[in-house]
Amino acid sequence: KNIFIPLGMHHTTYNPLANGFKKFAATSHGNPYEMRMVRDTLLGYVYKEINPDQWNGWRMYTLRGEVNDGNAWYALHGVSGHAGLFSTVDDLQKLVDMLLHEGKVGSKQFISEKTIKLFLTKDDFKNGLGWMMDPDNSFMKNAPAESFGHSGFSGTSIAVVPSLDFSVILLINRQNMGLLPTGYYYNPNPIRRQIFDAV
């Protein structure tokens, strides 16, 4: 109510099924990657306190309108800072436009310029607050220095180039194809880079 509604982001929400939304893409079929995470010592997340084969809480159906991330789904009821936000390209562009215009929406200062500057100031790892800002280490390869972006586990991404006043928002889904024989999902970075470079 403090961000999405005032920005006119009427198709952006957590838990869309509970909020009357019906149109959204499916993510994965169940939790195959997370099932692997708690079993496979190579991934480093083996949970020894329970036997994942005896736990019957795995989602074994195609996920539609549910956050894909297991921590957000099981522990945080679909609402978290790292996962679970459902949106559209049009709505996300409204958020990007506000960032590009130093916190302004039209003539109204929505978020202070100081806060926007804080969001988009590189730390020691060349990241802002919630934003990747190292163009040599992301799908925004060779972008101008002030560029910023964000990617999601399911394949989504936003790339913004303030000096050129443009953004690329991709709401793709790498999980619909299931896991590769290696046990991982497809890497969306090559197609992200190709689209970003083309734009």
Question: Model-found features: residue ranges?
Answer:
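Short, gly/Ser/Thr-rich active-site loops of penicillin-recognizing serine hydrolases
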Residues: 101-105, 114-115, 178-199
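Short, surface-exposed beta-strand/loop micro-motifs that present aromatic residues
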Residues: 147, 154-167
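Peripheral terminal and inter-domain segments
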Residues: 135, 140-145, 151, 179-185
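Short, surface-exposed loop or secondary-structure junction motifs
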Residues: 1-146
